[in-house]
Amino acid sequence: AFCKAGFDILGIIAPYGSLTPYASNIIVNITIMALIIIGGLGFIVWQDIYEKGFKFKKYLLQTKIVLIMTINLIVGGAVLFYLFECQNSLSSLSQEEKILASFFQSVTCRTAGFNTVDVSHLKPSTSLLMMFLMFVGGSPGSTAGGIKTTTFAVLTIFVYATMTNKSEANAFNRRFDSKTIKKACSVFLINFIFIFISAIALFDMQPQLPMQDVFFEIFSALGTVGISTGITRQLTMLSKIVIVLLMYCGRVGSLTLALSLSRKKKISNCKNPVEKIAIG
């Protein structure tokens, strides 16, 4: 749980059941959720908290963004999961168990790989929600995958600043530099390209597979989550290779991988002239 592997030996209780037999066990759920959250915050954040205690105003900008984003994603994801699945996969549980399962699924999507409900019976809206959470993932310097909470936060703030006609993107009285924004845009676009190419490849090789399940598998692999709707066993050798490559890209990091493949260029003082083009 801490390292976001998602492996378990609970198949001896229920084949491919993960933690579904413990959906109502508060101790198991809270323990696993705590390990997932601790591992997903990142060592930079924990170092900052250790040095400055619980004084939020003194934290680094990254620590503030990570904590705020983590809380929002967990609570928001849990509320939406509950609303979507209350009369579906959660219908057999009590009210308290529904809330517990909703929070667990919201936490585990970023990016642990355990589940306490049957993922194969989720509604399309819930699957999309989980894909979003898997895509965002954890935080930089952690054991989690995804584009990271800081990347999503920077992009969101930058888009808001653009829509409100502000010249700069600011958060907690700090300004994001252009290099940070460029990196965030690059990470988002590179991951989107990985998803698009992988989807085309899998649909071409195995067109009989449901679209929802294929995309779920892709997001889960790229986010190094490990949750599956059950189609992994149906994948051909080539399809599995695609999934393996996605997991590798997700673990190494899309931007790191792209930079490692690019050639080093000499820094030049000469710049091309600027010319504006229409956007949107």
Language model features with spans:
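Membrane-proximal intracellular helices of multi-pass ion channels
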Residues: 1-280
